[in-house]
A protein has these predicted regions:
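Iron-sulfur cluster-binding electron-transfer modules in prokaryotic oxidoreductases
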Residues: 1-170
Length: 170
């Protein structure tokens, strides 16, 4: 695909170039993960970009971000709850310059997060910092956490094996 798009781009100057490193579509289905033995719950709002794409090719771990998050929550003893109709939800940041669309996106997200968190009983994790910031500024009355903040809080519940490898933190 990359070679074809590059050749077409060079010939016509009109066709977009699709690089080899372009992330592939994320086909992972988001469903609640509940274990009756777990007493703790977390609402996970996976953002538009992270729902649309999986990680770049070339990594040993081919799981989606959602699968990794679910795995860490499982190891820490947390049930994972997705907001209803997550595929239609957006924090509104992309529409910030379109006030009515931004307000509607935030209203829809607030309603879904309120329902999923049972009125704010459970913490809500957002997996993209810019989207977290936008939601955090505009949604009141719910405990909204950036994914890194939540992972820091569950770290004591995880058995972490040190490794001598390079890791990427984004």
């Amino acid at each position: 695909m990359a070679k074809i798009s590059e050749d077409a781009h060079q010939i016509t100057g009109l066709t977009p170039y699709v690089p080899e490193t372009m992330p592939k579509a994320n086909t992972y289905k988001l469903t609640n993960k509940r274990n009756p033995a777990y007493q703790k719950n977390v609402v996970y709002f996976s953002t538009c970009a992270n729902r649309a794409f999986r990680q770049n090719q070339g990594y040993d771990d081919t799981r989606s971000l959602q699968q990794v998050f679910e795995s860490l929550c499982d190891k820490a003893g947390y049930n994972v709850i997705y907001p209803p109709h997550i595929e239609n939800l957006c924090c509104g940041l992309s529409f910030e310059n379109y006030e009515e669309i931004d307000k509607q996106a935030l209203a829809d997200l607030t309603e879904a997060l309120t329902k999923a968190s049972e009125g704010g009983v459970y913490p809500i994790v957002i997996d993209h910092s810019a989207c977290f910031n936008h939601a955090f500024k505009h949604i009141k009355g719910l405990k909204i956490l950036d994914i890194s903040e939540f992972l820091y809080t569950i770290l004591p519940n995880l058995n972490v094996t040190k490794c001598n490898e390079s890791v990427i933190v984004h």
